[in-house]
A protein has these predicted regions:
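Conserved PLP-binding active-site segment of the aspartate aminotransferase-like
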Residues: 33, 235, 312-317, 333-370
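Inter-domain helical "communication" segments and dimerization helices
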Residues: 199, 264-273, 294-299, 321, ...
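N-terminal small-domain helix-loop-helix segment of the aminotransferase-like
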Residues: 10-97, 267, 332, 373-376
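Conserved core segment of the aminotransferase class I/II
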Residues: 210, 215-280
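Conserved core of the PLP fold type I
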Residues: 59-184, 189, 195-211, 282, ...
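A non-catalytic, amphipathic alpha-helix used as a structural packing/dimerization or gating element
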Residues: 71, 242-245, 276-288, 362
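Conserved glycine-rich beta-strand-loop-beta hairpin in the small C-terminal domain of fold type I
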Residues: 121, 263, 280-290, 300-314
Length: 376
């Protein structure tokens, strides 16, 4: 456990480093840093056709309900019921401007000042929590979590292809976490950004299905297009009114046009057929990156993920120092230090979805040369 002051300084340093990566990125930079989907897989033609239909309705440019347009909420609720086995109604869905906004909305509606996170954890969530002056406590094992959870704090968890570790909670761990939360009457924020990105298209039911005092976050960013900034919160109906007050104070409502665009896209296309294509393409890219690591940097130890967008592993030395050297040679990746509250690390995260096959190979070969020069 770390003091609020130490954690705040640490988070600000990490955000500064993320900005350093972005600022230093040139056109010829090979970036394995961001969680960017493969733009070649964006359904441009389908969205273009959908947009023409949407523009025939002048309501697409009008204000709309803060909770989100009803037909889109119905479709999202149907995904929970039919694909996740988690019975859900449209009244239990709130549309957000990207799932990132969900952190702000939820935390402004709750009185919890302390948030428990898995170590390592998603930098975007850590940054959002600190901007709201929340105390962050991390844990590694469930025994630690049992001692930390109480009725006045909440747990933030990514149960599928965790960012950055790529870990997936098995059914036993999901049940254990639900039981721990239930025994202590705590609150769960479960981030489901990657839950559909399973290379074998096998979807697990979220922890939230097992525990009602929960908020499950979803997003179209990884499965349709991130630029539309469309996400959602799934929670019990009695929580929605509290969330609406916070949502209205932020942006009144999520873009009407973008909601209607996604809604029309879902009317005319099979979303899960599209997701299956994404998973097949990502699995091939992951295998290729893994092959390149084994060939050119065999000292980088990792386990191949079964889904998601990242390979996470460990070098023989401080990954932050290596990342800064690599950035000077226009190779970007994220050292794991930014995902920890206050810890140096040899671990690192590499995105395999954004760059081409050619650049994956070239980038890892260049990184291998940088490591060789460092060792000499």
């Amino acid at each position: 456990m770390y003091s609020n002051i130490i954690v705040k300084k640490g988070i600000m340093m990490k955000r500064s480093y993320i900005r350093e990566i972005l600022d230093a990125t040139e056109e010829d930079t090979i970036s394995f840093a961001g969680g960017l989907p493969d733009k070649e897989l964006f359904p441009l033609n389908e969205l273009s056709k959908a947009s023409k239909k949407v523009f025939k309705n002048d309501d697409c440019l009008q204000y709309s309900k803060s909770q989100g347009i009803e037909s889109l909420r119905e479709k999202i609720a149907s995904i929970y019921t039919n694909k996740l086995g988690f019975k859900t109604s449209k009244e239990e869905i709130l549309i957000t401007t990207g799932s990132q906004q969900a952190f702000d909305i939820i935390l402004k509606s709750l009185n919890s000042n302390q948030i428990i996170v898995e170590s390592p954890s998603y930098i975007g969530a850590l940054g959002a929590f600190k901007m709201l002056n929340k105390e962050i406590i991390d844990f590694k094992k469930l025994k630690e979590l049992e001692k930390l959870v109480n009725s006045s704090n909440l747990l933030y968890a990514i149960s599928d292809y965790q960012n950055p570790s790529t870990n997936v909670y098995n059914n036993k761990k999901r049940k254990s976490i639900a039981n721990i939360l239930s025994e202590n009457n705590s609150t769960l924020i479960e981030d489901g950004a990657y839950c559909f990105l399973n290379f074998k298209n096998k979807i697990k039911a979220p922890i939230s299905k097992l525990y009602s005092n929960s908020y499950h976050l979803g997003s179209f960013s990884k499965i349709v297009a991130p630029g539309l900034r469309l996400g959602w919160i799934r929670t019990k109906e009695e929580n929605i009114n509290k969330l609406l007050a916070a949502k209205e104070s932020l942006d009144l409502h999520t873009s009407t046009f973008n909601q209607m665009l996604i809604d029309e896209y879902l009317n005319s296309n099979d979303l899960f057929e599209h997701i299956s294509k994404i998973n097949d393409a990502y699995n091939k890219k992951m295998e290729y990156m893994a092959k390149c690591f084994k060939k050119y940097i065999p000292s980088f130890k990792f386990k191949k993920p079964k889904g998601g967008m990242f390979i996470y592993g460990s070098f023989n030395s401080d990954s932050m120092k290596l990342a800064k050297k690599a950035l000077k040679d226009n190779i970007a990746f994220v050292p794991a230090e930014v995902f920890y509250i206050n810890k140096k690390s040899t671990e690192a995260r590499f995105n395999f979805t954004n760059e081409s096959y050619e650049n994956i190979k070239l980038g890892i070969k260049k990184l291998a040369n940088i490591i060789a020069k460092t060792q000499n």
